Amino acid sequence: MAFNFNWSPLMADASFYTRAQDLLTAALNKSPKPPIIVDDIIVTELNLGSIPPELEILEIGDLAEDRFRGIFKMSYSGDAFLTLKTRVQANPLNTYLLTRPSFASPLPLAAATPLTIPLQITLSDFKLSGFVILVFSKQKGITVVFRNDPLESLKVSSTFDSIPFVRDFLQREIEAQLRILFMDELPAIIHRLSLRLWVPEYRAGEEDQDQNTNTAGEGPGQDPLASPPQDPVDALGNALNESEIASLSLDSSVETHSLFSQKNLLRLAALTDSQRTLSLFTPSIQEVVYRAWTSPSDQGDISGGVTSPLSPALSRTQSQVGGMSSFQDNASTISSYSRTSTSTHTFSTYGLNLGAGRHSKAHARKRKKRVVDLRRPKQPESETASVTDESSFTETTSAPSVRSAPLPRVNEQPDDPVTPPLSPDSDFHLPPIPERHRFSISRPALRRDIATEMLRETGESSSEPARRHAEVDDIDATPRTIIRHEPSRYEGEKQEAGPSRQLPSTILPFTEEKSTPGPVDQALVERIAGEIARRMREDKLMGTNSCAFWNRPGHEESPPPAYGQ
């Protein structure tokens, strides 16, 4: 089966070429152009030539009077040509810098000056070969689809043929663009041309669209001053009167100020401020876009700053760090008695950090040394008792406490109104408790310390046989021996003080059933009971907070009593 194509009517129709040139121009400018081309590509001349393409029928799928579908093998080596006109950039440095970010370029002044040269390109000697799927319908036009890349070669002639480098570059670029044109744009162009030829409705719709486009482009422009805003202002933000608005026009020789609503100016100012910085002391620099700025609601917070009539003043925002407790100078704040969080103890005051070195985790538990070096010279009984007391207190030591300073001794009136006089100095003194053990002892050891302090304040002395008898009775060699064997020389004073109160359960470790309580013993026991009750009340007030010692209200420290009394 053979077909006879009438190629001459297509060459004679001038309107067909005009429409084809417009479609080709739109198709060439649709895809992204290389940076060297700085202007639109315009098709100035198009000629299909006198030699038709050769078609070989491979398959016919549908055949009727008004429709046809088949697969062809096409080959073309004719005299068709195409002429294009555009402008190119002759300075390669300018092209290079346009494709790079500004911060990565040296920004030359004269070397990157653009130099555009008009360029005319003629494409001829097309050689095409490929498989084409052709679908023809009078209602839907012609649809052509290339199953492969049909372009084999073509000849590119330009004004830069004398420069081999530019000629080869243009050859490669144009071939790449034409391959895209044949595969994507040419089928759409052929389909639109066929609709214009065989479908009258499509032709009438295109004519109406062209008329509407021409009508919209003609006529005088709209005057934006015909309906001015309600509250117009000039470029400096000053309000304009009606007479000043009437004097303004588009054709006026006087410089026309842009009229904006005050509400819109505030919105634009807020939008501009939102892109500025959050820095407190960043000046307002012209032609500089900041990242962010504070909101216009905070414009009254700053006293001095760079302001403009179009934007509110820069406000100062106070930033706070969450989770960190601030220090207060008032030591009597009630909230300081409670433990808020871990960060409160992390950022402690200076006083609590004085003993942090000796209460570190590396020295939390001191090794207990119960071995006595017998090679040393023999010590007196008082020193031996001191060693025994030290070891006994070490054995009752619990986990290290968080307190870094001893509790202060407060001068307070005791429960007993009668205070016995201090006894004269004696050669025997109670052994002092080392500071490191007194800081870290538990509750029972603290009560022993209270009894020792009370006896140290009274400073009473006893006879040597009584001390030996106390050492035999009491194995622990604690100050309880002296409590049970005090001389009864304050009997008369105790009777004047009144009947004794019932002892609390906390004093039971200091008493013994087999000992006969005397008047002096009752007086000391009552004093010790009152001291223990007072300290228990203070402990309940202070709680377990390590900062409670420094925040106790209404207490003044007094120096400890002299140990030599």
From Swiss-Prot:
Subcellular location: Mitochondrion outer membrane
Domain remark from Swiss-Prot or TrEMBL: Lacks alpha-helical transmembrane segments, suggesting that it resides in the membrane via beta-sheet conformations similar to those predicted for other outer membrane proteins and porin. The SMP-LTD domain is a barrel-like domain that can bind various types of glycerophospholipids in its interior and mediate their transfer between two adjacent bilayers.
Listed Basic and acidic residues bias regions: 371-381, 446-472, 483-496
Chain intervals for the UniProt region annotation (Disordered): 207-236, 296-317, 348-504
Entry's Gene Ontology molecular function annotations: lipid binding
Key words of the record: Lipid transport, Lipid-binding, Membrane, Mitochondrion, Mitochondrion outer membrane, Transmembrane, Transmembrane beta strand, Transport
Keyword Transmembrane set for record: yes
Biased composition (Basic residues): 358-370
Description of how the protein assembles with itself and partners: Component of the ER-mitochondria encounter structure (ERMES) or MDM complex, composed of mmm1, mdm10, mdm12 and mdm34.
Organism: Aspergillus terreus (strain NIH 2624 / FGSC A1156)
Family per similarity comment: Belongs to the MDM34 family.
Annotated PANTHER family: MITOCHONDRIAL DISTRIBUTION AND MORPHOLOGY PROTEIN 34
Name of protein: Mitochondrial distribution and morphology protein 34
Annotated function: Component of the ERMES/MDM complex, which serves as a molecular tether to connect the endoplasmic reticulum (ER) and mitochondria. Components of this complex are involved in the control of mitochondrial shape and protein biogenesis, and function in nonvesicular lipid trafficking between the ER and mitochondria. Mdm34 is required for the interaction of the ER-resident membrane protein mmm1 and the outer mitochondrial membrane-resident beta-barrel protein mdm10.
Top-rank taxon, per record: Eukaryota
Example GO biological process: mitochondrion-endoplasmic reticulum membrane tethering
Entry GO terms, CC: ERMES complex
Biased composition regions of type Polar residues, renumbered to the chain: 382-401
Domain (SMP-LTD) ranges: 1-195
HAMAP family tied to this protein: Mdm34
Organism placement in taxonomy: Eukaryota, Fungi, Dikarya, Ascomycota, Pezizomycotina
Topology with respect to the bilayer: Multi-pass membrane protein
